Amino acid sequence: MLAEILIAYIVALLINKHKSKSILVLGIVIHVGLLCVFKYTDFIVSNINSLFNTNLSLLRLAIPIGISFYTFQILSYEIDVYRGKVKVQRNLLKLATYVTLFPQLIAGPIVRYETIEKELDERKETKEDFAYGVTRFTTGLAKKVLIANMLGELCKVFLNGTEKSVAFYWIYGIAYALQIYFDFSAYSDMAIGLGRMFGFHFLENFNYPYISKSITEFWRRWHISLSSRFK
């Protein structure tokens, strides 16, 4: 992580100085390459061994915590610097703070640099924000423990059952869909709550996606911090 932060710091400074798309592409290749090395090398090697009956050794690299999320954040920062949406951060410590914000590091939401750019310099903690943060975190924790986990256990019961009917598949499908939503949105709620306690205002990550009337609308409402990257 420290190496990636340093790379992002240097790449962003070079992008800001030279306005070069080539430097941006180089930065993207480096960060995505590191992500693939840590997450997918052993998967690729295992498949090669299976397909060609080889005995290549697995690297068994320890995957850095939150690598997917902080890679997306670094990429969005470098892209926004290139587009001129944000000023380049010349303070390495503040850039590191942005990348390593612990509330959302593991499960999101993916926080754009422009969202907290000012708060890195002039963050204010208030009683109202702290109270809201506690409430939001508690709500997320309850969604995870009382709803998502229970739905997960229900799905296990269905999978281990012997009777497989049309009604079974309907109930299982609905339970599984709700489990995914409550599990993921619970982590986002907890991250938003923790961030608010420390004076950071993260954007919402879910907006009732299951009431969507189209795939496009669903995409806009589900994992908003990711889908907004492609606009």
Regions found by a protein language model. Name each.
Residues 1-231:
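Membrane-embedded transmembrane alpha-helical bundles that form the catalytic cores
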